[in-house]
């Protein structure tokens, strides 16, 4: 027997499932057998006594979970951090555990009352004593980890739990002797799994399957080469014996009903201290402020959910609620993250929501030089669609050329510092680029409940009068088109060939002819099939009047391409009279600029199609400047490209029959975006009908 190893247990005299505080308890209230629980506990107790010393804490009536002594606290040397239970059903256990620790000569540290930490259930020492694995996500708070590092003088590695079945770290994670680790990867987020893989060599990691995990195979007591558990599959037992462990199974099914097994029923109270190991914690905290219609728009919920979903935790320090419906609210939130990497990701997302530092915490943005043309520093800040300002030398500077997925470059000009979004290929050596997430803020429009609730419209979806809902969107779009046209504004259309295939070409042609469109962006295909329809009456070989395939029609588009190539351009085809109507005809006749961006699948292509991708992107960006509205008509590829080039504030209408496409295009966080799930030909037909109701015939000033 290894007499120096000691464990603390509590007899199950008052054990029962009296309430539900984890998924395992659901359906098991008062369904546990006291006699069987005592028998199973005694089985574990006797096995453990053969390999270690076992101390007992006195059971207390009214506290059925006192039997799970792993949650008493966390012991290292002569120090113990007492648990702060999340649920009131267990908070009454704290004084009894504190009394036992103090009576046995331990120095007891107590966390603030509002900071949950559930002891060795959520904090497991590496069996070599090198560091402490600390879990968070369901019971213990991430903010408790710096206290553990300070009081126990040890490096703390934070792991986020994401499967509610494994609500404590010890239900899915068990450090073993000789540097081995038994764990269930599915219980952790990707960052935590990566951290585990960085710290534990592949040959030392024993990853278990879900079938073993739900039998609490990781809730194991390890005494040197002995592992004591509820149950293990033959494959798991073979893995453990293969690396030198002796597996001892003892049934603990009565305790599984409350969400615990062998490890939960024990607390190791002799944990040696390594003198060369000292405190190190990677948890970062930062206080942010967010303002707006936080409640009725759901903004505060989105911000807090975003923090948790990205791997952080939060504490709302102050919340000032607007006094009236039109008043805005403000909140100060402490954000914590397990590492700087995760903190950067969280803050980047919060910046998109309009979060800012407290005035006293404002700092200049961090800059790093571009070393190689077209290559940003590794940690560069990725720009978004929202108007952005960066803090340089104590001054906030507006970022020019706002767009998604760029870097923010800082250059000195005769008129002062210039901050502008640049795509990576345009970066030049010597420029300074914003890195990290300090000194960055976005300027967001105040968002109300009404705006959030009218984001996306579906045609023929569930609900009452869904067709009417699409008509309502069409009415709004028509009204906006009319207003922009009459004010001399700019509307850009990006369209795919489906517009032609669905019979929408004549309606789009009319929009161009009547002055509602100031630029057309698309690919080779929309022009090819538009011209095919107007020269040969087919689109992709289908007769547009009868809706049937024409014999040999699959060759029509190639003949059209060949004809236009012979003339040299679409404009020359119009001038020669071979193109007499259609979308491209109206663009040429009304001097509406168009850009056709090529792709690897293009036939021909048409002579007007820009096959240089970089030039095509530049031409797209040029024609998007000054746009007030963009109609994205059934072209996911080109529409996504346009969306990435477009700053917030531009109204976007995304139309596609595929809901996934609409969601992808419209869900960019812009409150000006509207998604319409419907047939694009039908949408354009409804749109022109609605415009007829709003306006008198329009006479073109050109031609």
UniProtKB/Swiss-Prot annotation:
Source species taxonomy = Bacteria, Bacillati, Cyanobacteriota, Cyanophyceae, Nostocales
Function, in words: Bifunctional enzyme involved in a cyanobacterial arginine utilization pathway that produces glutamate and enables cellular adaptation to nitrogen fluctuations. Catalyzes the hydrolysis of arginine to ornithine, with the release of ammonia and carbon dioxide. Then, catalyzes the conversion of ornithine to proline, with the release of ammonia.
Q: List ligand-binding residues for L-arginine.
A: 22, 65, 71, 90, 139, 170, 258
Where are the stretches annotated Ornithine cyclodeaminase?
285-694
Cofactor binding note: Required for ornithine cyclodeaminase activity. Can be partially substituted by NADP(+).
Q: Which controlled-vocabulary keywords does the entry list? A: Hydrolase, Lyase, NAD, Nucleotide-binding
As recorded in UniProt, coiled-coil segments are: none
Q: How is its activity regulated?
A: Ornithine cyclodeaminase activity is inhibited by ATP.
Quick one: effect of changing residue 168 to A?
Loss of arginine dihydrolase activity
Provide the protein name.
Answer: Bifunctional arginine dihydrolase/ornithine cyclodeaminase AgrE
């Amino acid at each position: 027997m290894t007499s120096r190893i000691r464990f603390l247990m509590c007899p199950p005299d008052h054990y029962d499932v009296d309430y539900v505080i984890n998924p395992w308890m659901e359906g098991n209230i008062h369904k546990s057998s006291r006699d069987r629980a005592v028998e199973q506990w005694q089985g574990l107790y006797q096995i453990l006594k053969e390999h270690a010393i076992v101390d007992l804490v006195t059971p207390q009536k009214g506290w059925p979970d006192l039997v799970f002594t792993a949650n008493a606290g966390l012991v290292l040397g002569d120090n113990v951090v007492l648990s702060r239970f999340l649920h009131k059903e267990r908070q009454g256990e704290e004084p009894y555990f504190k009394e036992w620790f103090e009576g046995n000569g331990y120095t007891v540290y107590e966390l603030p009352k509002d900071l949950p930490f559930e002891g060795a259930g959520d904090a497991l020492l590496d069996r070599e004593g090198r560091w402490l694995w600390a879990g968070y996500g369901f019971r213990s708070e991430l903010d408790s980890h710096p206290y553990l590092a300070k009081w126990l003088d040890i490096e703390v590695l934070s792991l986020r739990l994401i499967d509610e079945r494994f609500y404590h770290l010890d239900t899915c994670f068990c450090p073993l002797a000789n540097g081995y680790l038994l764990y269930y990867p599915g219980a952790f987020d990707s960052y935590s799994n990566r951290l585990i893989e960085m710290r534990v060599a592949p040959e030392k990691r024993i990853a278990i399957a879900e079938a073993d995990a739900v039998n609490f195979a990781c809730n194991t007591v390890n005494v040197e080469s002995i592992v004591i558990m509820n149950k293990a599959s033959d494959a798991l037992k073979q893995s453990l014996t293969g690396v030198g462990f002796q597996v001892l199974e003892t049934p603990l099914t009565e305790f599984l009903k409350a969400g615990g097994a062998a490890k939960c029923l024990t607390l190791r109270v002799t944990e040696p201290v390594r003198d060369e190991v000292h405190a190190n914690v990677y948890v970062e905290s930062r206080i942010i402020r967010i303002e707006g219609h936080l409640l009725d728009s759901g903004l505060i919920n989105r911000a807090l959910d975003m923090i948790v979903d990205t791997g952080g935790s939060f504490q709302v320090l102050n919340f000032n609620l607007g006094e009236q419906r039109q008043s805005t609210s403000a909140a100060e939130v402490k954000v914590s993250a397990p590492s700087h990497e995760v903190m950067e990701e969280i803050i980047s997302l919060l910046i998109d929501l309009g979060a800012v530092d407290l005035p006293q915490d404002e700092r200049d943005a961090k800059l790093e030089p571009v070393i190689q043309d077209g290559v940003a520093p590794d940690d560069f800040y990725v720009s978004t669609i929202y108007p952005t300002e960066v803090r340089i030398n104590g001054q906030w500077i507006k970022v020019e050329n706002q767009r998604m997925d760029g870097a923010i470059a800082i250059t000195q000009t005769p008129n002062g510092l210039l901050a502008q979004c640049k795509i990576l290929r345009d970066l030049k050596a010597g420029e300074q680029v914003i890195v990290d997430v300090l000194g960055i803020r976005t300027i967001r429009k105040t968002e109300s409940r009404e705006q959030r609730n009218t984001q996306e419209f579906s045609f023929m979806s569930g609900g009452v009068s869904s067709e009417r809902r699409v008509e309502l969107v069409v009415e709004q779009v028509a009204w906006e088109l009319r207003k922009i046209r009459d004010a001399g504004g700019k509307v850009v259309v990006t369209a795919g060939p489906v517009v032609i295939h669905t019979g929408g070409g004549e309606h789009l042609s009319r929009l161009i002819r009547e002055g509602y469109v100031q630029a057309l962006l698309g690919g080779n295909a929309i022009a090819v099939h538009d011209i095919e329809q107007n020269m040969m009456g087919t689109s992709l070989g289908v007769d547009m009047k009868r809706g049937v395939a024409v014999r040999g029609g699959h060759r029509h588009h190639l003949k059209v391409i060949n004809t236009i190539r012979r003339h040299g351009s679409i404009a020359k085809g119009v001038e020669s009279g071979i193109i007499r109507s259609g979308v491209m005809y109206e663009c040429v006749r009304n001097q509406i600029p168009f850009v056709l961006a090529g792709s690897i699948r293009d036939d021909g292509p048409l002579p007007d199609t820009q096959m240089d991708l970089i030039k095509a992107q530049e031409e797209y960006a040029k024609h998007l400047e000054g746009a007030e509205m963009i109609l994205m008509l059934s072209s996911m590829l080109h529409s996504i490209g346009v969306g990435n080039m477009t700053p917030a504030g531009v109204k976007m209408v995304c139309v596609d029959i595929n809901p996934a496409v609409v969601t992808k295009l419209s869900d960019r966080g812009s409150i000006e975006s509207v998604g319409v799930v419907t047939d694009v030909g039908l949408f354009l037909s409804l749109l022109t009908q609605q415009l007829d109701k709003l306006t008198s015939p329009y006479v073109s000033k050109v031609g």
